[in-house]
C-alpha cells in the first residue's frame, strides 16, 4: 500500500468514525442513563484524530513541508483541530455537549475535503516562493487551531439561543447554576425570578422554567465564554505572526488583503464579545448573539474569502 492509498483510507475511516461518533454522542444525550456511550464516542473520536494526524504526517513526510499549503490539507487540519480541541475540553469538563456540537462540524469538514474537492485539488503541489518559510507552520497552524476553538465556543452560543427559543434570559447566577435571573417575555415587561426551596423557579408572568434547564443554560453560557477566551489569544498571536511573515515576504506588515481584512473583522467581533462579558458583565442572549455572528465571520474568513480567488492568500486554494 502506497502513501496515497493509506491517506485515502485514513480519511475515509475518519469520515465514517465521525459519523459513528456523532450518532453515539447524540444517543448519550437522548439516553443519559445508558452508561459508557460518552466514553465510546470519545474513543472513536480519538481514533479519528489519530487517523487524521497520520494523514497529515504522511503528507509532510512525502512532500517535505508542513501540510498546510492548499485547501484540502487545510480542511483536514481543521478537522483534526476540532477533534483535538473537543477531546481536550471534554477531558477537562466531562460535558456531553461538546462532542454533540463539534463532531457534526468536523464530519462536514472532512466530507467536504474528501468528497466535494476534485482529485487534482487534493494532490500536493510545489510551494510558491512566499510559502517557503518557517512561518508557514507557526502562522497557519496557530490560526487554524484558533479557528477550531472559536468555532466550538460559538457553537455552544448557538446552542444556547436554540434552547432559550428567543427568550431574553439574562443569567445572574454563577457558572454552576445558582442565583437568580431575569426573563423578558415578548409581551410584558422584564420580571424578576427567584428559586424557592423546592427548586422550581417562579416569576410574575407565571412562566415556569425548570431549575435543571437553568443549570444547563448557565453551564453552556459559561463554557462558551471560557472556550472563546482560550481561542482569542491564539487568534491574536496568529494575526501578529502573519503580519511579521508578510513583512518578510512582501515588505509590508498589512496590505488590506481580503483575508487580512476578514481576520481583523473576526478579531474585532470576538474582542467585543470578551469586552462586553468582562467589563459590562454580559451573560445570556446578548453575548450569544455576538458569538453566533462570530461563527459566521470565521467561516467567511476561512472559506468565503478563498472562493473569491483574489488577494495574497488565494494561491493554492480556489484561485
Swiss-Prot record:
Its main location: plastid. Keywords: Chloroplast, Cytochrome c-type biogenesis, Membrane, Plastid, Thylakoid, Transmembrane, Transmembrane helix. Pfam families: Cytochrom_C_asm. One of its GO terms (biological process) is cytochrome complex assembly. HAMAP family: CytC_CcsA. Required during biogenesis of c-type cytochromes (cytochrome c6 and cytochrome f) at the step of heme attachment. This is Cytochrome c biogenesis protein CcsA. It comes from Porphyra purpurea (Red seaweed). The gene is ccsA.
Amino acid at each position: 500500500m502506497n502513501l496515497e492509498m493509506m491517506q485515502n483510507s485514513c480519511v475515509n475511516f475518519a469520515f465514517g468514525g465521525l459519523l459513528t461518533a456523532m450518532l453515539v454522542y447524540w444517543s448519550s444525550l437522548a439516553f443519559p442513563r445508558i452508561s459508557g456511550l460518552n466514553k465510546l464516542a470519545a474513543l472513536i473520536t480519538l481514533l479519528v484524530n489519530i487517523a487524521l494526524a497520520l494523514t497529515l504526517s504522511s503528507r509532510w513526510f512525502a512532500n517535505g513541508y508542513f501540510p498546510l499549503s492548499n485547501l484540502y490539507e487545510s480542511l483536514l487540519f481543521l478537522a483534526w483541530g476540532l477533534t483535538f480541541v473537543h477531546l481536550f475540553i471534554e477531558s477537562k469538563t466531562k460535558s456531553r455537549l461538546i462532542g454533540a456540537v463539534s463532531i457534526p462540524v468536523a464530519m462536514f469538514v472532512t466530507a467536504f475535503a474528501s468528497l466535494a474537492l476534485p482529485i487534482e485539488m487534493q494532490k500536493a503541489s510545489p510551494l510558491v516562493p512566499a510559502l517557503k518559510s518557517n512561518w508557514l507552520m507557526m502562522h497557519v497552524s496557530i490560526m487554524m487551531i484558533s479557528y477550531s476553538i472559536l468555532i466550538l465556543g460559538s457553537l455552544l452560543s448557538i446552542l444556547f439561543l436554540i434552547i432559550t427559543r428567543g427568550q431574553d434570559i439574562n443569567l445572574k447566577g454563577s457558572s454552576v447554576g445558582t442565583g437568580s435571573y431575569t426573563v423578558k417575555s415578548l409581551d410584558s415587561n422584564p420580571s424578576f425570578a427567584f428559586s424557592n426551596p423546592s427548586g422550581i423557579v417562579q416569576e410574575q408572568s407565571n412562566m415556569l422554567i425548570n431549575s435543571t434547564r437553568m443549570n444547563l443554560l448557565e453551564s453552556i453560557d459559561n463554557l462558551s465564554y471560557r472556550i472563546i477566551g482560550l481561542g482569542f489569544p491564539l487568534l491574536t498571536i496568529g494575526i501578529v505572526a502573519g503580519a511579521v511573515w508578510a513583512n518578510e515576504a512582501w515588505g509590508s506588515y498589512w496590505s488590506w488583503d481580503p483575508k487580512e481584512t476578514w481576520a481583523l473583522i473576526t478579531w474585532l467581533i470576538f474582542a467585543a464579545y470578551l469586552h462586553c462579558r468582562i467589563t459590562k458583565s454580559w451573560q445570556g442572549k446578548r453575548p450569544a448573539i455576538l458569538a453566533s455572528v462570530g461563527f459566521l465571520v470565521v467561516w467567511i474568513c476561512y472559506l468565503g474569502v478563498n472562493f473569491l480567488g483574489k488577494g495574497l492568500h488565494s494561491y493554492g486554494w480556489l484561485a
